[in-house]
Each structure stands twice: as structure tokens, then as C-alpha cells.
């Protein structure tokens, strides 16, 4: 359930885009009414989907705050990035900004892991996981490096899809491609870590 909740803005973005794409005349009328004139019919689906994603992220944070009176830093970061890039897309009626949003998030994560390890000598992956698993120090370093590299590569991959494929293909990749690659990476990490956990506990 938590995974679905975390993915809610992405899922609603996808659903809104598909619904608006199947009803372009109505979507164009709605987008023009809410976001101003000068919007092309083909732009309406991505603009409405962006607005839905922003509202979903705000609602997500509101729900978490009402239940726990505390919001994770990651949610605030997600809100800031969707507000900046999504807001720019809505203001300028230009989908380029929202297409850069996943890359900005990936590179922020990858950069944070790298800078923390290289400059501050802090392994953030270890800090997050050491309460659950015990690993040799070299494995922690490789794990941190692997995640940093994964996020940086995902940022480049997002841009490649955004600039070399159709808008609809990018929207599909945003949900299914990104999440699918993340799942495969996590499974691969699990197999790799299981060997070292077994070695340490035997």
C-alpha cells in the first residue's frame, strides 16, 4: 500500500494524460478555461496531467500531515520539484519543463549520495539501511555507489526518451519504464546483498 501511495502522483498523472488524450476537445476547453488562452489542442493532455500531479502531491502531503503530524523530507523535495517544473510547464504552456522533472529528481538523489560520500564521508545508503541489515564496509561503499550511478543513469535515460520518442511514449516510460527498471535494480541488489549477508552471519 505504501508503494502505491508513494506513486500516487505518477499514477494520476498517467491516468489524467490518457483520459485527456482520449477526449482532446473537452481537455482543450478545460485547459483553456483554467490555464489561459493560447493552448494548442495537442498540449492540453500534458498540461492537465501536470496540474493533476501537482494537486495530487499537495493532497498527499496534506494526508500524511493529518495522520502523522510529520512529513518526510522526500515528500517535501518531491513537492518542491513538481511545483517548480510543473509550475513552469503550466505557466509557459511548455511540456519541456515537466519532462525534465524526473531527471532533476534522479540527479538530485544521485548527486546527494555522491557528494555525501566523497566530500562528507557519509554513506547515506548505510545510514538508511544499517538498522535492517549488516554488511562489510566495502559492500556498503559499493551499494552507495551503485545507487548513485543508477539515479544518474536514469536521469540521462529519461531525457533520451523525452527527446527521441513521442510524448505518449515518454508518459508510458515515466510510469512503467521507470518503475520497471527500479524494480529490476532493487531485485538485483537483493541478490547481490544476500550473498554478503549470508557470509557475514555464518
UniProtKB/Swiss-Prot annotation:
It comes from the Bacteria. The chain crosses the membrane at residues 3-23, 46-66, 73-93, 100-120, 145-165, 173-193. The keyword Nucleus does not apply. It is found in: Cell inner membrane. It is a multi-pass membrane protein. GO terms for cellular component: plasma membrane. Keywords: Cell inner membrane, Cell membrane, Membrane, Transmembrane, Transmembrane helix. Its main location: membrane. The keyword DNA damage does not apply. InterPro entries: YciB (IPR006008). Plays a role in cell envelope biogenesis, maintenance of cell envelope integrity and membrane homeostasis. Belongs to the YciB family. HAMAP family: YciB. This is Inner membrane-spanning protein YciB. It comes from Aromatoleum aromaticum (strain DSM 19018 / LMG 30748 / EbN1) (Azoarcus sp. (strain EbN1)). The gene is yciB.
